From Swiss-Prot:
It comes from Xenopus laevis (African clawed frog). A motif (TPR repeat-binding) lies at residues 718-722. Gene3D superfamilies: 3.30.230.80, 3.40.50.11260, Heat shock protein 90, C-terminal domain (1.20.120.790), Histidine kinase-like ATPase, C-terminal domain (3.30.565.10). In the resting state, through the dimerization of its C-terminal domain, HSP90 forms a homodimer which is defined as the open conformation. Upon ATP-binding, the N-terminal domain undergoes significant conformational changes and comes in contact to form an active closed conformation. After HSP90 finishes its chaperoning tasks of assisting the proper folding, stabilization and activation of client proteins under the active state, ATP molecule is hydrolyzed to ADP which then dissociates from HSP90 and directs the protein back to the resting state. Molecular chaperone that promotes the maturation, structural maintenance and proper regulation of specific target proteins involved for instance in cell cycle control and signal transduction. Undergoes a functional cycle linked to its ATPase activity. This cycle probably induces conformational changes in the client proteins, thereby causing their activation. Interacts dynamically with various co-chaperones that modulate its substrate recognition, ATPase cycle and chaperone function. This is Heat shock cognate protein HSP 90-beta. It comes from the Eukaryota.
């Protein structure tokens, strides 16, 4: 609850800052930052947003501008009072807005920004996290915000950043509509009252803001007047200001043609004060200019003013479309991904929509598909109506054509970027997930997007290769692109699944991001070559006649063992077969063509809102493949042929299956039982009799039906474990 104090007749409410905001302000105030000038950029950006909002509302209700038709930003330095004031005629804030937006409700980015700051990030990132207002405390010891919204009274917010702020009804000079921010500057920050400093800061950060930014300065100039006028003026000054504040009068002599003769009336020069006003951002919208006339520096400055980014963009596309439909667009790719790129609740405001240079909105979902939500820029249409509503936008055919063109130009830009290996590497690190999401969602552009993918492979080492490069290296008899999905490059490179494929000299693509699983569900082929997972059934490697003959012989030789293993494992596997993919591993678990891979199963198990009925169906399709050339499998076959009811055979089959599950990337349903089997085998290997073990109460997690292994009589025999 706020504290309420009565100052005369004024009611002043005091509120505590929300904890994270108080922490952020403390960080801003008590840490030294060299580039404090960004506070001006942030306040101008907030003013511009407020002006955008009132202009958008006025398109459907022109009376909203009755409280002030001019949409502008004024900057007023005052040396005497050591204040820097910024006034906008934007939408203003109600009392509730003032309390919520400036102190009691933390934005989602507050904590993320503090973490970034503590990790060494630049203070100039503040605008990207939605907390730019608080940068005012980089230069101010006290901030006063006076604001008037059409639906409320004029209020004043004030804080010296001591953990609290006050709000009261403002009885001072009415501002009509909008917001006035008064910064009471720290003693060592008076440079921001200087004309040159303000001008260069606005030019650097805010010259492309779409509203006039006017600087008001009190200046002096010399004025020539007659002695009589000087006397009159002196008297007036005395009355108005008192004797102490009279203007300094400078006598510059008299104008005489001949001394002592024909005297003319004497004149004086006095210094008078006046208010000089200068518009600081006269540059016309950059997207309306010819791209050939715009320098990279200008693009960079515009990008920074548009996005509040502290770094230059990575790439830019400036184009216009003419004909039946007319629009201009300027698109940028950031140098790095924002912290909340895939946050569902995030307001999408990366592309600003203008109609004939008038800003309409900055959250138009229909303008660009979700997978391109990192692209920043502006689109200026000549054909959309000025008063278009969101509902009309959803149905607009014009917008659908604009969207199609934007996607096409974005893909062109990505392809151009791909020609520069170093820059594309930076781009891919930040936005590869977006490209893969595009392959999953955008069937029209799937082929183009697939050309932009880059993966580590069994032949590229630390470098990444495109699928086009993979195809160019394919062997003559190779018909498919082989890939494996998993958690990391090292894990998949050492997987049993790639043993035979690599030994035969075929390249394997390593897919190590969870989104790759969704991507390959849609990307069935590339350049006429089918994508084949080496972890699924039906892997067919090119074979000569000798290899085919050997495979058939092994199938016959191990047929009875496969049948026995299927009986022992029952519903745990769909079938047991002889493998053509293993070299040094005794066995592996593969999934059916349409089932989930081990990696996909892991991803789905991690989903909080998973569908258990689907999981039960998809997870059941496991196939056990055995390596006919491995001594463990060969010895097991011999034991099974001798006595298929041998308990040791059954135990070893279960142990082999569970170990294969783990090595193939699956998880165990009952890891404790598996662990107990391993412990008993370790005891057997160490020659420890179960009778020698310390007698303790049985753990409830250890099933009673796992008897000790009979190690002394026959080291190879074990009790059956169900």
């Amino acid at each position: 609850m706020p504290e309420v104090a009565h100052n005369g007749e004024e009611e002043v409410e005091t509120f505590a800052f929300q904890a994270e905001i108080a922490q952020l302000m403390s960080l801003i105030i008590n840490t030294f930052y060299s580039n404090k000038e960004i506070f001006l950029r942030e306040l101008i950006s907030n003013a511009s947003d407020a002006l955008d909002k009132i202009r958008y509302e006025s398109l459907t209700d022109p009376s909203k501008l009755d409280s002030g038709k001019d949409l502008k930003i004024d900057i007023i330095p005052n040396r005497l009072e050591r204040t820097l004031t910024m006034i906008d005629t934007g939408i203003g804030m109600t009392k509730a807005d003032l309390i919520n937006n400036l102190g009691t409700i933390a934005k989602s980015g507050t904590k993320a920004f503090m973490e970034a700051l503590q990790a060494g990030a630049d203070i100039s990132m503040i605008g990207q996290f939605g907390v730019g207002f608080y940068s005012a405390y980089l230069v101010a010891e006290k901030v006063v915000v006076i604001t008037k919204h059409n639906d409320d009274e004029q209020y004043a917010w004030e804080s010296s950043a001591g953990g609290s702020f006050t709000v009261k009804v403002d009885t001072g000079e009415p501002i009509g509509r909008g917001t006035k921010v008064i910064l009471h500057l720290k003693e060592d920050q008076t440079e921001y009252l200087e004309e040159k400093r303000v001008k260069e800061t606005v030019k650097k950060h805010s010259q492309f803001i779409g509203y006039p930014i006017t600087l008001y300065l009190e200046k002096e100039r010399e004025k020539e007047i007659s002695d009589d006028e000087a006397e009159e003026e002196k008297e007036e000054k005395k009355e108005e200001e008192g004797e102490n504040d009279k203007p300094k009068i400078e006598d510059v002599g008299s104008d005489e043609e001949e001394e002592g003769k024909d005297k003319k009336k004497k004149t004086k020069k006095i210094k008078e004060k006046y208010i000089d006003q200068e518009e600081l951002n006269k540059t016309k919208p950059i997207w309306t200019r010819n791209p050939d006339d715009i320098t990279q520096e200008e693009y960079g400055e515009f990008y920074k003013s548009l996005t509040n980014d502290w770094e230059d963009h990575l790439a830019v596309k400036h184009f216009s479309v003419e004909g039946q439909l007319e629009f201009r667009a300027l698109l940028f790719i950031p140098r790095r991904a924002p912290f909340d790129l895939f946050e569902n609740k995030k307001k999408k405001n990366n592309i600003k929509l203008y109609v004939r240079r008038v800003f309409i909105m900055d959250s138009c979902d229909e303008l660009i598909p979700e997978y391109l939500n990192f692209v920043r820029g502006v689109v200026d249409s000549e054909d959309l109506p000025l008063n278009i509503s969101r509902e009309m936008l959803q149905q607009s055919k014009i917008l659908k054509v604009i969207r199609k063109n934007i996607v096409k130009k974005c893909l062109e830009l990505f392809c151009e970027l791909a020609e520069d290996k170093e820059n594309y590497k930076k781009f891919y690190e930040g936005f590869s997930k977006n490209l893969k999401l595009g392959i999953h969602e955008d069937s029209t552009n799937r082929k183009k997007l697939s050309e932009l993918l880059r993966y580590h492979t069994s032949q590229t080492g630390d470098e990444m290769a495109s699928l086009t490069e993979y195809v160019s290296r394919m062997k003559e008899n190779q018909k498919s692109i082989y890939y494996i999905t998993g958690e990391s490059k090292d894990q998949v490179a050492n997987s049993a699944f790639v043993e035979r494929v690599r030994k035969r000299g075929f390249e394997v693509v390593y897919m190590t991001e969870p989104i790759d699983e969704y991507c390959v569900q849609q990307l069935k082929e590339f350049d006429g070559k089918t994508l084949v997972s080496v972890t699924k059934e039906g892997l067919e490697l090119p074979e000569d006649e000798e290899e085919k003959k050997t495979m058939e012989e092994n199938k016959t030789k191990f047929e009875s063992l496969c049948k026995l293993m299927k009986e022992i494992l029952d519903k745990k596997v769909e079938k047991v077969t002889v493998s053509n993919r293993l070299v040094s591993s005794p066995c592996c678990i593969v999934t059916s063509t349409y089932g989930w891979t081990a990696n996909m199963e892991r991803i789905m198990k991690a989903q909080a809102l998973r569908d258990n009925s689907t999981m039960g169906y998809m997870m059941a399709k496991k196939h056990l493949e055995i390596n006919p050339e491995h001594p463990i499998v060969e010895t097991l076959r011999q034991k099974a042929d001798t006595d298929k009811n041998d308990k040791a055979v059954k135990d070893l089959v279960v142990l082999l299956f569970e170990t294969a599950l783990l090595s193939s990337g699956f998880s165990l349903d009952d890891p404790q039982t598996h662990s107990n089997r391993i412990y008993r085998m370790i005891k057997l290997g160490l020659g420890i009799d179960d009778d020698d073990a310390p007698i303790e109460e049985a753990s409830p997690s250890v099933p009673d039906d796992i008897p000790p292994l009979e190690g002394e009589e026959d080291a190879s025999r074990m009790e059956e474990v169900d």
